[in-house]
């Protein structure tokens, strides 16, 4: 079956019995072949094929944008991260990664994968240059969004260095054809300001009380003292409030019906990210 990849030329899609066979075919970068396991829903099969076309186009244009989200209220930060990921997924190939321990991302987005961020980070540590070939099974899909379920081992998050997160994210974006990667910067990340520093755009949740707002001010003061004035000035602060109580079962579906989501969507122009 010939797949017309437009400006990237014509590629041949090979339907395989096993994921391992598909990955082996995809490692032959010069043969213009796309290996796909045929035992999956049709929309996932099409998504996999299109990813390789996008990968070629994004490599040429250098259009990958990393979006970092930070804040001292974990729940609000995760909601803001998900909202950003959902908005961006409507206009470009988007991946969401939460570096929060016990973030419940897999529960929110109904993950059925047996692999998660722990597996992806393990592959990354084994081979920084080729790890993207071994994390395909860790990438899940929800509507138009791709995501990696949260790590099942807290130490995997606590042990990773900021510069490793940056290399990890850039490697995935470069090799797997994402336009946007949204990073939920969790509490266990050491020196989260360094992760913000490698992002193209940064967001932070506004505080609801005196203590939380003081923590934000102290963080900004520290970053300025460290010469990160430009990052502090570029942070977009968002007040995250849910209009109604939302259960885990319908959180993803109800996100667009909240005021903060609409405000976020009206101020975020993905085409200019």
Where are these regions (language model features)?
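Conserved beta-strand segments of the P-loop GTPase G domain that flank and frequently precede/overlap
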Residues: 1-2, 13-17, 68-70, 97, ...
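Extreme N-terminal, non-catalytic leader segments
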Residues: 8-66
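Short, well-ordered alpha-helix to beta-strand connector turns
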Residues: 9-11, 16-18, 30-32, 91-92, ...
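Walker A/P-loop phosphate-binding motif and the immediately C-terminal alpha-helix
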Residues: 63-109
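Phosphate-binding loop that captures ATP/GTP phosphates
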Residues: 91-147
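Cytosolic-facing regulatory segments adjacent to core modules
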Residues: 130-139, 149-185
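Conserved catalytic-core segment of NTP-binding enzymes
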Residues: 167-258
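NTP-binding/hydrolysis catalytic cores, primarily Walker-type P-loop NTPases
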Residues: 251-273
């Amino acid at each position: 079956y010939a797949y017309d990849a437009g400006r990237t030329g014509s590629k041949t899609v090979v339907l395989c019995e096993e994921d391992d066979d598909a990955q082996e075919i995809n490692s032959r970068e010069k043969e213009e072949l796309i290996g796909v396991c045929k035992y999956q829903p049709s929309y996932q099969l099409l998504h996999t094929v299109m990813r390789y076309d996008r990968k070629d186009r994004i490599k040429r244009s250098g259009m990958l944008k990393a979006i970092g989200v930070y804040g001292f209220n974990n729940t609000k930060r995760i909601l803001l991260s998900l909202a950003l990921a959902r908005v961006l997924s409507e206009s470009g190939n988007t991946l969401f990664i939460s570096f929060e321990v016990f973030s419940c991302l897999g529960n929110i987005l109904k993950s059925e994968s047996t692999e998660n961020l722990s597996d992806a980070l393990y592959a990354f540590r084994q081979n920084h240059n080729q790890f993207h070939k071994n994390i395909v099974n860790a990438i899940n899909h929800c509507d138009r969004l791709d995501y990696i379920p949260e790590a099942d081992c807290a130490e995997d998050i606590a042990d990773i260095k900021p510069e490793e997160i940056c290399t990890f994210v850039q490697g995935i974006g470069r090799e797997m054809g994402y336009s946007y990667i949204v990073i939920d910067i969790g509490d266990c990340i050491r020196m989260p300001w360094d992760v913000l520093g490698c992002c193209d755009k940064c967001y932070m949740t506004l505080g609801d009380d005196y203590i939380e707002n003081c923590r934000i001010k102290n963080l900004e003061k520290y970053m300025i003292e460290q010469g990160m004035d430009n990052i502090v000035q570029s942070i977009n602060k968002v007040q995250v409030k849910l209009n109604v109580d939302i259960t885990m079962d319908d959180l993803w579906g109800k996100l667009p019906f909240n005021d903060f989501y609409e405000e976020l969507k009206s101020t975020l122009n993905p085409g200019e990210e």
